[in-house]
Amino acid sequence: VPVAKLAVFRDPIAARADRNMAIGYTGQAYLWLDNKASAGGNPWLNPYSDEAVRFIGDLIGEVQSMGFDHVLLENVQFPSAQNGKQDFGSTGGRGRSAQLAADIAAWDARFEGSVTLWYGYSLGQVTDGASTVGGSATALGVRNLVVEVPAKQTMDDTARNELRNTLSASG
């Protein structure tokens, strides 16, 4: 089955094209970058932006119109760099995990019955919890989870059981 893969919030092209969908610097009119500009830093789409969530939904619809019935969404997360200079605009009082869960629920509802959405996360984001997702990716309400295990990392029986238990506990 052909699967389309989309980078979601880590989309520097869309962030530059429509600054209203991007993370900004607090108190400035500049786009926030995940590294120094001289080191190739890139802007990200803002998970709190309704416009960004709609835009991503429109991208899913576009790949669906190309004939893809399965879409893998990666980078459904916040940037790992947290320096207090990021301006997410109005958060509505939602934490990171709650916001990502709401974004995921919106896409799942929009494409229910027409596209199977898969969400890709690293092993660490699933088992250890991460600031990029506001906890464990298993708490986001994801129905179809793809777990990326680093090629150099072998999983012993204990690690395999921990992953199995984490995934089982999340439903």
Give the role of each language-model region.
Residues 44-85:
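Active-site groove signature of glycoside hydrolases
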Residues 56, 63, 136-139, 166:
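Generic structural signal for hydrophobic
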Residues 157-171:
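C-terminal soluble interaction/assembly domains
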Residues 52, 56, 100-104, 160:
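Aromatic/hydrophobic pocket-lining residues that form the small-molecule binding cavity
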Residues 117-122, 126-159:
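Aromatic- and acid-rich polysaccharide-binding/catalytic face
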